[in-house]
Amino acid sequence: GCPQGSISGPYMWNLCMNGLLDRLSAMNERIVAYADDLMIVANGNSRMEMERMADECMRIVYEWGREVGVSISEKKTVCIMLKGKLNVDGRRMRVAVAEGTISSIGYVKSARYLGVCMGERMSFADDIRGLITKVMGAIGGLRRVMRKEWGVKKKTAYTWAKGLLLAGVMYGSSVWYEGMKYKTMRESMNSIQRCAMYACLRVCRTVSTEAMQVLLGWLPCDLECVKDKCVQGSAWHRNDESDLVTDAEIAEKRARSCKLMKEREHEIWQRRWCESTKGRVMHEWLCDVNFACERMWFEPSLRVGYILTGHGTLNAWLYDRDPLDSAACPCGAPRED
C-alpha cells in the first residue's frame, strides 16, 4: 500500500499507481482509484462475462503488485453485484493470482468504499443505518450539557448539531442523494435529524419531526442532501433537469443561482409544512418555516415550547396526579387540557 507518514510517499505512490491505471484503462472498464484503494467496475450481459472481465483485470493487478513489490489484501478484496437480479449468495469468483495459482474472491451483500457503504443494486440503506448509530452515540455525549431546563444556548447547540453532526451525515450525499426519492430513505434521514433536534429543543418527545424542524429552523435532512449535491454540481456543472438548479441557470450568475436554490428548497419545505397533518397547533403560531431560520434569537423556554406544540402548561395532567392544587389554565379557563 501507500507509504504512511512520508512527505514524498503519496507523490511517489501516484507515479507508481499510474502504471497500473494505464494498463487497466486498456480493458475499457471503469476504474476508480483513491490513494491505495482501487475499485473495478466490470460490465457484461451475463455473470460469466462479468467474472471473465473482472478476472482479466485482477490478473493485471496481481502482476503489477509483483513488479512493484506490494501485495494485494485478499481480506479486503470483495465482489458485489451493483446491478441486476442475479443470485450470487455464497458464490466465489475464481481469479488467477499467478501462473498456475488460482485464488477466489467472495461475493458480499454490501461493501464500504471511501467511507460509503454500498449494497447490492446500488442500495445505500446500510450506510444510512450506520449513520443512525453514529449520531445516537454523538448526541449521547452532548446531552450532558444540553438539558431542557439548563445548559448551552440554542445558538450554541444549533452550531454543534449542524457543524459536527450534519457534516458527518452529509458525507457522500452527492453519491446517494437519489435515494431520497424513496419514502423509507427520507424517513431514515429525518429520524437521524430528529435525534439531534430533540437534544437542541425544549419540547416533549411526542412532538412531530416536522414541528421540530420548523421550531428549530432546520431544513429537512432529505432536502439538505439534494442541496449538498446541487452545490457540488454547480461547481462542476453537472446538474441535470431533475435538480433544484440546472447548469443553464447557474451559467447566468453563481450568486443568483445560490439565491434561487435557497428559494426553491424553502418553497418545497413550506409546501410540506402547510400540507402536513402533523403539528397543526404549532402551524397556527408558526406558519412560516423561515421564522426561526431568520431569527436566531428565537429560543422558546420549556413552558413556551409546550404551548407552541399543543401540550399546554400540563396543569390538568399534573393536577390529576396530585403535584398541583388546581387544574386551571393561566388564561382563566377552569381546566387546562
UniProtKB/Swiss-Prot annotation:
One Pfam match: RVT_1
Source organism superkingdom: Eukaryota
Reverse transcriptase domain sequence ranges: 1-118
Enzyme class: transferase
EC number: 2.7.7.49
Signal sequence bounds: none
Region described as Nucleic acid-binding endonuclease: 253-337
Catalytic activity: DNA(n) + a 2'-deoxyribonucleoside 5'-triphosphate = DNA(n+1) + diphosphate
Keyword terms of this UniProt record: Endonuclease, Hydrolase, Nuclease, Nucleotidyltransferase, RNA-directed DNA polymerase, Transferase, Transposable element
Molecular function, one GO term: endonuclease activity
Protein name (database record): Retrovirus-related Pol polyprotein from type-1 retrotransposable element R1
